[in-house]
């Protein structure tokens, strides 16, 4: 027997290790996809209004200032739990009215504070955007954001 590692043994270790880690990567990718589709996404609540709200979110580039579940900019508050912060679980009508009033009141004009631009949303657009924000609150975000205030 040779004192060191032979070429064929090294080749077998390389191919075996490569195959093992490729299969591990494929399994983890499949599991991640399965988890996202079956566990963390609220497909039942994904209505046309929620989809329209997502389009409004994208069209107005809200993600350039806000974040949802940590994705986006950190210039303005995290919005994945804004429905909860406005009391949507206890009083959905008041939460909808409060969110709509807040968005329509922008910009506040307070000196020294970051300002949200004014948006001229129709009632239907506002309702869809709020439906989208409500839907994001229902996603299993694994306790994100870490602070309730976003």
UniProtKB/Swiss-Prot annotation:
It is a single-pass membrane protein. Its main location: membrane. Keywords: Cell membrane, Electron transport, Heme, Iron, Membrane, Metal-binding, Respiratory chain, Signal-anchor, Transmembrane, Transmembrane helix, Transport. Heme c binds at residues 62, 65-66. Signal peptide: none annotated. GO terms for molecular function: electron transfer activity; heme binding; metal ion binding. Pfam families: Cytochrom_C. It comes from the Bacteria. The keyword Cell membrane applies. GO terms for cellular component: plasma membrane. SUPFAM superfamilies: Cytochrome c. It is found in: Cell membrane. The chain crosses the membrane at residues 13-29. InterPro entries: Cyt_c-like_dom, Cyt_c-like_dom_sf. Component of the anaerobic respiratory chain that transforms nitrate to dinitrogen (denitrification). Heterodimer of cytochromes b (large subunit) and c (small subunit). This is Nitric oxide reductase subunit C.
């Amino acid at each position: 027997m040779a004192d060191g590692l032979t070429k064929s043994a090294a080749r077998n270790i390389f191919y075996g290790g490569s195959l093992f880690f490729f299969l591990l990567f494929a399994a983890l990718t499949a599991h991640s996809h399965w988890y996202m589709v079956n566990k963390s996404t609220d497909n039942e609540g994904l209505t046309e209004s929620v989809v329209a709200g997502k389009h409004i979110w994208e069209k107005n580039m809200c993600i350039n200032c806000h974040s949802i579940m940590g994705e986006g900019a950190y210039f303005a508050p995290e919005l994945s739990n804004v429905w909860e912060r406005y009391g949507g679980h206890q009083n959905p009508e008041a939460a909808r009215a409060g969110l709509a009033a807040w968005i329509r009141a922008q910009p506040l004009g307070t000196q020294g504070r970051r300002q949200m631009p004014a948006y001229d949303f129709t009632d239907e657009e506002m309702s869809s955007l709020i439906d989208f924000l409500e839907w994001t609150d229902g996603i299993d975000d694994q306790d994100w954001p870490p602070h309730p205030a976003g």
